[in-house]
Amino acid sequence: MLTELNGKGGCLCEPARKGELRCPLIVRPSSEDVVTGQLFGTLKVLNPRWWLPDLLNTALGTERFRKQFYRDLRIELWQKQRTYPRQHLQWDEGQTEVDVVISWENPATTVFIEMKYGSNLSATTTHNNGSDGFPSDQLIRNARVGLRENGWFYEDLLFEFPKRDFVLILLTPTRGNPLVTEYQHPDRLRTAIPHGERLTDLPRSPFIGELSYRNVTDLLSQQRRLFSPPERTLIDGLNEYLAFKLTQLKAANGHGHD
């Protein structure tokens, strides 16, 4: 972070900036993985009572989560999920890697976060281009995998596992992705998932939402007084970093981000 803020992060060649070239030798400052690591590396050490419920409620547009002590809170990055059962898909699919997984146990809850920085939400995945009649974007894949991982699909198992509350959030420089609104409708969500009739129930609606980077910095600024002095120092550094990353995008594409 300090390297970038002090202008030592280097720059991208044009093919790399457009996403046409990937360099395996270095993680570029423009990588969304770098932003993910900085953002959630900081949030991990802040008191979750003062940021987690407000962040989720902002994403969902409703007061669904309350301030509380979070038992067994875990924030994990780039977590691989179980391979989705082949018999429930019309295409081959490998393991899904979720950018951020937040979980706690009172009540049992799992949050998937899909992070984006310099690229758009992918319209297709590696083995699914949508030709089988189902949407193939990253958001619906994460929704499908998350619902199964948290017990919302009916499966012919010897033992039934208890359901966990589930939330899926798209975190990008700007809000307004139409897929978020589309998949918030239960009927549309079911028709977008193979064997959607197995979804006999769904988490409390809405459970799919979105955040912008500015939502995050605004929330941390508003809640800053509730944190300890060391936490405030971390918040100030993170807010400066995210503002810097938004400025980089603005310079690259000629418009701002809200």
Question: For each predicted feature, which ranges?
Answer:
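Charged, terminal alpha-helix-loop-beta segments
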Residues: 1-258
